[in-house]
């Protein structure tokens, strides 16, 4: 054993979950650039910096010689050339269809497992022009290394402001809403404050109990309705395809401020409305009606149960964090997987008023925020994995329809080694659902990325179309009311 291969660390419970058979989740980050990528610059940077990040210079080993039998992280020497791939691209062969080439290339990655004999990440440099970039960099890493927020903090640490290439990107301070709730009744008398505090506590306990019972039922038998976006789902090992769309973050903020809600509420409302209309189209096609997405004909069944697992960041400090703080020992904004899932029911129906889905989404999320199910779900997972193993959790996600995630990205345009980034699209594969939706804010943009099982959802661009239409209808309705 070499000197570099002496430090071992057991996997965290969440890392063990992501490594378990039948899950094997990986995160893919696609980054568009305004100019071609120089592979030599990327390789040189990795040689100097990869050793600073413990998970990116550690491989997975099975330890049987210590007090802990099982998988562990072992620090090892990294040969970066083994992790960076630059495929030869015949521009005549792809016939200027750069988007199709990138889509096919990344889809093939989902069928190629990461090599566990070395650190679980790789980078693919695709110097091909697409509709929104001159080149695309694809980073793939196993979910056991980190969650999306950790990876975003790592990416931001590697970039500089495009407006000033000597300056690090701005890292905005984001406070949890819960931290401000103590001031909610500050101007009222002690009696009113006491009554409200008791009512608040009772609601919190009740909501938590109900959510825990629903979580338990979901892990055992409580399934979503089989719909065109979930029927015939096979294994999480099936090939996945990815599609992204860029919309205006300013439009989302306009709706957020006008409706007095959060960005997450707006995104949930847009997704709920878009999936309703997409499902209406799919049911129409299935019934032979041949409806278009603009049709008012309601083809939806009477009752549909669709739930989304919404990712919740459990760190005390949310948003992008300085990388050195995340890597520090006992950090409150620690590196790794420190998030949970809250299962949110969707109201699937065709609404004539574009604002109704927003109000429904806000009502649902307000109740979920007034519950301790997210941190308790995380603690329960840790306890059961440490006690019984990981198999029990395979069913919880497979009994729901989709997963949603929203990650805060750079607040201004940034560059990597002087090459301006046009978009950041983060997604994943290995999950059992046929649909996963990620949102990432970048400067004044919101990038929507959809991961699908093409055997179940052959037209993911139609979902993005419906999301754009929903967002525009909501904005136009609010603009009309303000005139």
UniProtKB/Swiss-Prot annotation:
Pathway annotation from the record: Glycerolipid metabolism; triacylglycerol biosynthesis; Lipid metabolism
InterPro entries associated with the record: O-acyltransferase_WSD1-like, O-acyltransferase_WSD1_C, O-acyltransferase_WSD1_N
Lumenal domain ranges by topology: 223-483
Enzyme Commission number(s) from the entry: 2.3.1.20, 2.3.1.75
Main subcellular localisation: membrane
Swiss-Prot/TrEMBL induction comment: Induced in roots during drought and salt stresses.
Name assigned to this protein: Wax ester synthase/diacylglycerol acyltransferase 10
